[in-house]
């Protein structure tokens, strides 16, 4: 796994990363481009700490995923604290460890995070929300996070905590497309 920090610029091509925590964390103004790769993480909140497989956080921090297969227990991709992620294609899924329900989102956009989804497939095993917009509790009402769903296929219509737990509204011109069947975790 790796951490991109303090304005670094990295292009990942055709790589495989299996991690027990973050596979990749992009922070502090970094620029990350993923051109084909497989990323997995076994981190979950049941062991006292958590990490999404790919995390983008901080003002001026940007991640572009042109294609990747990303799976994690806690979650696949998260963006927060002023970061921006653009997803053009790939498979983004979470899976449950032994029926404990400790998995969460294919994409989580939290705490002033910003995401644009142009394509890809999103799934969260055992949950009704594969994409999440906004924080929990009182923080949700003032969270300026945004997600633009312009393409892709989804296991469900997501969860918009900013607007009271409603489904996420797709961008103008995009019609929500549901996955024909669930994404099954593949052993690596």
Predicted regions and their residues:
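Extracellular beta-strand/beta-solenoid scaffold signature
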Residues: 1-5, 18-28, 41-57, 71-80, ...
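Polar/charged alpha-helical tracts
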Residues: 81-84, 98, 172, 181
């Amino acid at each position: 796994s790796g951490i991109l920090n303090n304005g670094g610029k990295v292009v990942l091509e055709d790589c495989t990363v299996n991690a027990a925590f973050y596979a990749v964390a992009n922070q502090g103004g970094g620029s990350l481009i993923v051109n084909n790769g497989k990323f997995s993480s076994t981190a979950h909140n049941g062991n006292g700490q958590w990490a999404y497989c790919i995390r983008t956080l901080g003002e001026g921090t940007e991640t572009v995923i042109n294609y990747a297969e990303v799976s994690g227990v806690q979650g696949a991709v998260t963006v927060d604290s002023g970061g921006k992620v653009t997803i053009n294609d790939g498979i983004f899924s979470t899976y449950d460890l032994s029926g404990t329900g400790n998995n969460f989102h294919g994409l989580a956009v939290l705490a002033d995070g910003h995401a644009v989804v142009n394509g890809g497939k999103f799934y969260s095993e055992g949950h009704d929300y594969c994409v999440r917009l906004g924080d929990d509790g009182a923080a949700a009402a003032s969270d300026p996070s945004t997600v633009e769903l312009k393409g892709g296929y989804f296991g469900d219509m997501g969860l918009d905590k900013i607007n009271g737990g409603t489904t996420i509204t797709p961008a103008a011109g995009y019609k929500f497309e549901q996955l024909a069947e669930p994404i099954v975790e593949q052993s690596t």
